Amino acid sequence: MTLTVTDLAIARGGIPVLEGLSFTLTPGRALILRGPNGAGKTTLLRTLAGLQPPLAGRIEGAEDKIAYAGHSDGLKPTLSVTENLLFWAAVFGGRDITPALEGFALGDLADRHAGNLSAGQKRRLGLARLLVTGRPIWMLDEPTVSLDRDAVAMFADTVRAHLGQGGSALIATHIDLGLDAEVLDVGPYRARPAPLDDPDGDFL
């Protein structure tokens, strides 16, 4: 499934942050999202994932195809690692959780409550949810936060496997994941500020 974005404009808190953005994301490809802090990367990912509406433009190919992993891991702290994955698997159609446990080395933590995990372990569990969604397009917002070097490599391998199976990924990160991916710099698409009112204009 190809994701096509055409002349997109988005806002954060009612203030436009990006405009005129167009790109395509085809199966088997990854796109790395770059730009300074506050440029609108998170807002873009949230908009593409359907969590907020765009100001203008078109998003095609996203219907029920996107899995989003943001800054919040979205875990149920009183449930075990296994129970968390089973919960999300049920939400997305009841997929086998074994690949998720194995892909992020969570087997030894399977019975531990999510609330008792370290920050890095929580992040791994949050990312493991991607593997039980069955959705082909991944939207990832700084996915390597709290991960050590081995876990970053594990994550990169998971993304490569996903791409190899015909999936795609849009990733906001400043870390070199070693992926064969193009870079989308949102800097040139930052919204122009609205012109200020001229209180003296009526007197000129």
Swiss-Prot record:
Reaction it catalyzes: heme b(in) + ATP + H2O = heme b(out) + ADP + phosphate + H(+)
Membrane topology: Peripheral membrane protein
Record's keyword terms, sorted: ATP-binding, Cell membrane, Cytochrome c-type biogenesis, Membrane, Nucleotide-binding, Translocase, Transport
Cellular localization per UniProt: Cell membrane
GO cellular component: plasma membrane
GO biological process, one term: cytochrome complex assembly
Main location: membrane
InterPro entries cross-referenced by the UniProt entry: AAA+_ATPase, ABC_transporter-like_ATP-bd, ABC_transporter-like_CS, ABC_transptr_haem_export_CcmA, P-loop_NTPase
PROSITE patterns linked: ABC_TRANSPORTER_1 (PS00211), ABC_TRANSPORTER_2 (PS50893), CCMA (PS51243)
Molecular functions (GO terms): ABC-type heme transporter activity; ATP binding; ATP hydrolysis activity
Family matches, as SUPFAM superfamilies: P-loop containing nucleoside triphosphate hydrolases (SSF52540)
Keyword ATP-binding: yes
EC number(s) on file: 7.6.2.5
Annotated ranges, domain ABC transporter: 3-204
Function: Part of the ABC transporter complex CcmAB involved in the biogenesis of c-type cytochromes; once thought to export heme, this seems not to be the case, but its exact role is uncertain. Responsible for energy coupling to the transport system.
Family to which this protein belongs: Belongs to the ABC transporter superfamily. CcmA exporter (TC 3.A.1.107) family.
Subunit structure: The complex is composed of two ATP-binding proteins (CcmA) and two transmembrane proteins (CcmB).
NCBIfam families per the UniProt record, alphabetical: ccmA
PANTHER family, A to Z: ABC TRANSPORTER I FAMILY MEMBER 1
This protein's name: Cytochrome c biogenesis ATP-binding export protein CcmA
Species per Swiss-Prot/TrEMBL record: Ruegeria pomeroyi (strain ATCC 700808 / DSM 15171 / DSS-3)
Lineage of the species this protein comes from: Bacteria, Pseudomonadati, Pseudomonadota, Alphaproteobacteria, Rhodobacterales
Designated gene of the protein: ccmA
